[in-house]
Amino acid sequence: MQIIMIMKRISLLLIFLTLALSASAQVAYNIEKDIPYHPGAGEYAAERCVLDFYYPVGVKDFPTVVWFHGGGLTGGQKDIPAGLKDSGIGIIGVNYRLLPKADVKEIIDDAAAAVAWAFKEVASRGGNPDKIFVAGHSAGGYLTDMIVLDKHWLEAYGIDADRIAGAFPYSAQKITHFNVRKKMGIGPLQAVVDDTAPLFHVRKLPMPMLVLSGDREMEMNGRYEEQAYFWRMMKLVGNENVFLYEFDGYDHVSMPYPAHNVVKRYIKGICEGKLPQR
């Protein structure tokens, strides 16, 4: 009798898993490629300022992540991170202008223009403009920080940065970016904090923020320590929902892999009105 009951429970579990997988498989995704988002900003902007939008089809009010690629502000291409796909989330992969053909403030402006595009356009594809998240890795994390912390960038497009539902900078430079310092003739180990540094714009945020870092012994020079100092300053100005994560065993390049899973948990929690447990 006990064996029969166990077999029934296993059968019910298999049926449940089959139904769950079937429901997941029924969600199709569309991708629109190379959408211009910053018209009128010049010839180089016309070349670089395009985005891809990956989103679930037939789903209403889905959340969207605006994703900025890394590359030291001098390279890289837009992408849709595999670790965020197939999760019921829209993902906008953004190209932006690069050093040295553009200066850093033009690049930050591109990031703001892309986020403004998201606020104005996601609803036409079924997305919820109240569930827009901003994220990026390395240089992309730096751009995430700048447009979330320094509100004037989005204000230029008629958007209040405080409408962003959550910010997830992955291993971002918190001081003035090293390639900006290089252009100024300043070495990689000499710190500068000017108005293009996220640390310069520390403020109390209405939305949650994750400060994400690779292993402190495997990261870029001082990168974990920058995250920790930035996190501490954000706590001191009154942020209760800013969380520091260090991914042991992962370097600067590989840390997005575990970070994506954490980010997906927070997106789900924020959308449901309850932050996940650490």
State where each predicted segment sits.
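N-terminal cap/lid segment of alpha/beta-hydrolase-fold proteins
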Residues: Q26-V59
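Primarily recognizes the serine-hydrolase "nucleophile elbow" in alpha/beta-hydrolase
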Residues: I35, F119-K183, D194
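Short beta-strand element of the alpha/beta-hydrolase
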Residues: D61-G70
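Alpha/beta-hydrolase
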Residues: F68, Y170, F247-Y250
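Short amphipathic alpha-helix adjacent to the substrate-entry channel of hydrolases
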Residues: Q77-V94
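Alpha/beta-hydrolase active-site loop
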Residues: A102-A123, M146
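The feature captures the conserved acid-bearing segment of alpha/beta-hydrolase catalytic domains
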Residues: G158-G166, A172-V180, P188-A228, R232, ...
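C-terminal catalytic histidine-bearing segment of alpha/beta-hydrolase fold enzymes
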Residues: A228, K235-R278
